[in-house]
């Protein structure tokens, strides 16, 4: 069972992840307006989206190493403050204060640097949660990952209708700064999650984290990382291109686009929560955690792939909503499983660096995907982009399934 302070710290991590995705995804919500105002092609828009990941990817690896070395409380606060201020700055792009397209690029780079702390810090705290509760605890990460775009899409669409896209960035950034107050006050739960009290009388000495070189030598690490790479490719395709596809290719209004996009995120939250609950329940009843997680992964990805393949040709509101919901529900358990698998195989002492590097390499799809998709859309339209995305997530899952037969802790050699 989780103590009250640790549970509160994990809830705050989930809120930070939601804010993380609200702020980074705001550029996609505003994409139809930003593209028109700055005259961006699909390829150049893809570069703007991709620029975030140029700093986010190395920041994840650095934060994973730092999370095993210094206070998660301080590291998280510094990162959140950095990305919140960058988000506010996005609201001044093109006004003479923050420049135009160059300002967009620079602020996205700063935002990526700050946002890199969230997942390694969250995994560091959650790795100490008992296995039978770890799935639902990870909903704070994967649920925030879906809740953020949902809130960002709905609230962002409303703010843009009332005031404009610049005001949307300012409101989102200010809301993120407010989060720092409860986080800084949650010291006890954060320290418990870090294992600061494991060396109290009667407790065994805390384990030293595995060396980074030992993590990188593990074939299982690379299989999980490939799975992460393919899974995030699918997510970033949805986050970055579903709104544009609905407006530019299907002719929906901004309001209709926000409602349809929100269907994906609502279904993602439902699928992720139900999947985590089912796995945790099976484990508490004596089920094999490795077997249940593998089954859930294959079933979820299959539903997501089918949805991606059928979406480009679907006609009518009801079939469109149904397919978007199926794709989101299928994708829902995937992010949760990515983190649970990494935390389980790394162990509590090494979860920060394992998940940090795993997430760092996995998010290379954020650099490659938006630009590649932009080139495909400019050259051949949206349908091939959906097909390529489905193929990538399906292939990554297949390779993982063949390479990792059991999801269990790695036996690290003594340092």
What are the functions of these language-model segments?
Residues 1-2, 191-224:
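Juxtamembrane intracellular "pre-TM" segments in multi-pass secondary transporters
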Residues 290-338:
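C-terminal transmembrane helical hairpin of 12-TM major facilitator-type secondary transporters
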């Amino acid at each position: 069972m989780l103590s009250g302070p640790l549970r509160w710290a994990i809830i705050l991590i989930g809120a930070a992840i939601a804010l993380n995705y609200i702020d980074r995804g705001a550029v996609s919500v505003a994409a139809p307006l930003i593209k028109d105002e700055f005259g961006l092609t699909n390829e150049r828009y893809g570069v703007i989206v991709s620029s975030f990941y140029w700093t986010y990817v190395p920041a994840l690896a650095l934060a994973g190493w730092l999370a095993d070395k210094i206070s998660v409380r301080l590291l998280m606060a510094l990162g959140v403050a950095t990305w919140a201020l960058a988000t506010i700055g996005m609201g001044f792009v093109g006004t003479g204060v923050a420049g135009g397209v160059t300002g967009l690029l620079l602020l996205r780079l700063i935002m990526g640097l700050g946002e890199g702390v969230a997942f390694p810090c969250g995994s560091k705290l959650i790795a100490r949660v008992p296995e039978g509760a770890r799935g639902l605890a990870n909903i704070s990460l994967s649920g925030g990952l879906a809740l953020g775009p949902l809130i960002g899409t709905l609230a962002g669409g409303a703010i843009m209708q009332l005031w404009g896209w610049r005001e949307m960035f300012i409101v989102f950034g200010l809301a993120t700064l407010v989060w720092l107050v409860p986080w800084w006050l949650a010291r006890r739960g954060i320290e418990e999650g870090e294992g600061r009290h494991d060396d109290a009388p009667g407790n065994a000495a805390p384990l030293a984290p595995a060396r980074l070189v030992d993590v990188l030598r593990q074939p299982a690490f690379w299989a999980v990382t490939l799975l992460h790479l393919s899974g995030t490719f699918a997510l970033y395709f949805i986050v970055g291109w579903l709104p544009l596809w609905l407006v530019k290719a299907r002719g929906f209004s901004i309001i209709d686009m926000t409602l349809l996009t929100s269907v994906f995120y609502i279904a993602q939250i439902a699928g992720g929560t139900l999947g985590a609950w089912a796995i945790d329940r099976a484990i508490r009843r004596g089920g094999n955690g490795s077997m249940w997680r593998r089954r859930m992964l294959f079933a979820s990805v299959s539903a997501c792939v089918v949805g991606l393949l059928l979406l480009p040709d679907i006609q009518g509101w009801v079939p469109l909503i149904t397919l978007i919901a199926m794709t989101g529900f299928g994708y829902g358990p995937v992010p949760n499983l990515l983190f649970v698998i990494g935390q389980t195989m790394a162990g509590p002492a090494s979860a920060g660096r394992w998940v940090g590097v795993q997430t760092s390499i996995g998010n290379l799809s954020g650099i490659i995907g938006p630009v590649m998709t932009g080139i495909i859309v400019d050259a051949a339209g949206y349908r091939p982009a959906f097909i390529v995305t489905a193929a990538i997530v399906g292939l990554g899952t297949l390779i993982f399934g063949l390479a990792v037969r059991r999801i269990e802790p790695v036996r690290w050699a003594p340092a």
